[in-house]
Amino acid sequence: MALKHFFYSAVTLAVAGLLSACGPQIERDNVRKSDALSPSQEMALSNVVSSQLAPLTLGGGDYLLLASEKRGLVLVDAEGAEKLALDGGKVERFALQALAEDQWLVAAYDEDSAELQLRLLDTDQGVPRIRYLAAMPTSAPQVALCFSRQAERTHLFAIDESGLGQEYVVHPREQAWEFTGVRPLYFGEQVSSCAVDDRSGKLLVAQPPLGIWSLNADAEMDEEREVFAAPADLDGKAFGGLWLDRASGNLWLTADDKVLAFNINAPAQGAQFKRALLNMEPVSAVTYHGQLLALAEESDRVQRYQVELPQPAAEMQAFRGPLEIPRVRASGQTVPVQSGGDAADDPAIWVNPVNPSASLILGTDKKSGLNVYNLKGALVEQFAVGRLNNVDLRPIQHGKFVAIAAATNRTDPGVSLFGITGGGEVEHLGLRNLDMEDPYGLCVYRKGADLMTWVSDKEGNVQLLQIVPGQGDIDWTLKKRANLHVSSQVEGCVVDDEMQTLFFGEEDGGIWRLDIAAFLAGTAEPQLIAPVDGERLAADVEGMGLYHAGDKSYLVVSSQGNNSYALFTRDGSQFVGHFKVDINLDKNLDGSSETDGLEVSSASFGSEYPQGLLVVQDGRNRMPSQTQNFKLVSWADIAETLNLQ
């Protein structure tokens, strides 16, 4: 009997302990229920079975679009009356993007066909209709879809159940719309939804239990992935259903039994709205004419709630997004370099004086050597001579060669020389060692009959060298003529041969100009003529080139920090304009970004480049993602975009 009483007491204490431990949670749940929102109205649906909704305006009327596991997509009016349905397919996720007036682009994942499908939602004589545009098979179910507008293009982000994301440009062709792949994105499992804020250019991804991520939507920028909202901010384990109210600047989402809203520009302020819903765990929530609408998973009921919603943030009214820089489409590209990672660096252009269309592009692979390309971007020749960084060339008078190219070599510190024949053959003339720890930047120029080169050490000093031809074809030497001390790292440089002026870029400082003759005479020092300001020039200042065309001559500079290219007057004293190199869908070319080196020529290279050619290193080679390469841009397109004519 005593033993039985002992067990009874032990069980009683254990249960009491459990109840005591659960007490705070039960108390919190009771408080939550007492404050939970009750629906003011219920919108009944007919055999929809939906887990996502979104509001839209069409033909002057207000509608809700719903994903349907039974009927694909269903459109209902403000009262819940059904207006159209696909009546086929199993859809849990869709993305919605406004196009022209009364036109919406819809991307949906159909589980029955395992396809990403594009449709156009519009009206025909005032009656809503939905039309098929295109479909693309997928290898895994898609769990998150969201659209982005970039440079008047429509981009689609699609993330599958394993966390592998893809960015596409979706665009019309003659017969149907196309999905053009831009890049992959990697998140890991349990992604639940995504949204894009086009004003800030941020892609937002919900990934329970890690939180909500924010990263750059533009593939030509670093991801800069950071936490938009941590799990503690969300107060729930199962969160998602991201929906952006662009008018107010609030990001709405669901978490367990709650609906939350965050200021898109100030997530650190915490949730601007957080309310539990009575007897409901929503998976999709939106605002609609001052009301909150919510939907449970696989539901046939939309709940309406009368509740005070957060007002548009004051800063949202003034926010206009990042400075828009004009864009010029890429005209061509070279094949990717063989080395992975940060490899391609600096180009030079050899103009064939007899047949300009047979000119060459020399490009460094700073992990292996020098690549030679034709103007179609095909690889003509490779020289595996070491880690070449910067390359430049000039024409010469010589018995065999019509031009000499020089490149800094960081494997065995020195300068590698190359000769170019009149027929376009490139020969390696060997390495000339330098008393320099790490040769980095380089630019070649002519001083009368002499061939000169400036070479920078990564630690800061810049040497002036003369390239002296010898008796034989490869018997060349370097003679040091002067030393220029600079305070920080210099890579990009170019010389105006006619004016005998050196321009060089201090990566985080700006553009400097030096009168070479006066410097050699001891009467001049470099002048800072264009400091880094974050807009016209954003650090790092990298590649430089001179476009020579009389009074239409320009200094062209790579502004790496904002992925743009700045034009200055020939003397560098005045800013003329800037541009980005953009996607060319007609040629299936991506743009360029994170550019190190560049070169430009005003020669006419034929119908594709009648006013000259700009070649830039592309640090992020997309469409599809590959190793780095060089992009080619027609100067005629640059001149038209910046009104240089």
Question: Which residue ranges define each predicted feature?
Answer:
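Gram-negative bacterial Sec-dependent N-terminal signal peptides
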Residues: 2-22
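Sequence/structural signature of beta-propeller domains
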Residues: 23-645
